[in-house]
Amino acid sequence: MAQAIIGAIAASTAGSALGAGIQVGGEAALQSQRYQQNLQLQENSFKHDREMIGYQVEASNQLLAKNLATRYSLLRAGGLTSADAARSVAGAPVTRIVDWNGVRVSAPESSATTLRSGGFMSVPIPFASKQKQVQSSGISNPNYSPSSISRTTSWVESQNSSRFGNLSPYHAEALNTVWLTPPGSTASSTLSSVPRGYFNTDRLPLFANNRR
């Protein structure tokens, strides 16, 4: 009887120990599985973030390259050379020249533009002065005399002829480049591209340093 009781107790204890061991082993396996799942999840999340950052950097580079290419194309269409267009896109100073209109950006490949949209600026054409006709009788009004009407008609005809006949947008000597002599220069040329008869260059400050 006592042996049976001791055997039952021993069997119960052994079963409890075996069950506890199985439970501990199961929990350890479950923890290991959770750890591997978390590790894989972190790796996938890091990989996803790295790919997204790479896509963002690539998209930003493509957008920047497109914007720079657009600016370069616009500058080239405006007449700038390839070197000046690239320098302007990069933020560097471009080539500038001095002419009779002042300092301007060099755009040798641009088409001539004017202040009038859709047409050219008319160049005044001097017309021969006409002698005033002397009226033999009556009260003469200079504002309504035949000579005034004739001058008005001649002026309108000259404007029409200059607008449709002369297609030059500038004066013949307006775009000639002038190279000024710096104050400390000893080897610069003093030749001007425009005849001295057009401008009194002796009284202009820009020509104060020209050697004679």
UniProtKB/Swiss-Prot annotation:
GO terms for cellular component: host cell cytoplasm; viral capsid, decoration. It is found in: Virion; Host cytoplasm. It holds the Pfam family RNA_capsid. Keywords: Capsid decoration protein, Capsid protein, Host cytoplasm, Virion. It comes from the Viruses. Translated by a ribosomal termination-reinitiation process from the bicistronic mRNA coding for VP1 and VP2. Homooligomer. The portal-like structure consists in 12 copies of VP2. Interacts with capsid protein VP1. Belongs to the norovirus VP2 family. Minor structural protein that forms a portal-like structure at a unique three-fold axis of symmetry, following binding to the host receptor. The channel formed by VP2 may allow the delivery of the viral genome through the host endosomal membrane. The N-terminus domain points away from the virion surface. This is Minor capsid protein VP2. The lineage of its organism: Viruses, Riboviria, Orthornavirae, Pisuviricota, Pisoniviricetes.
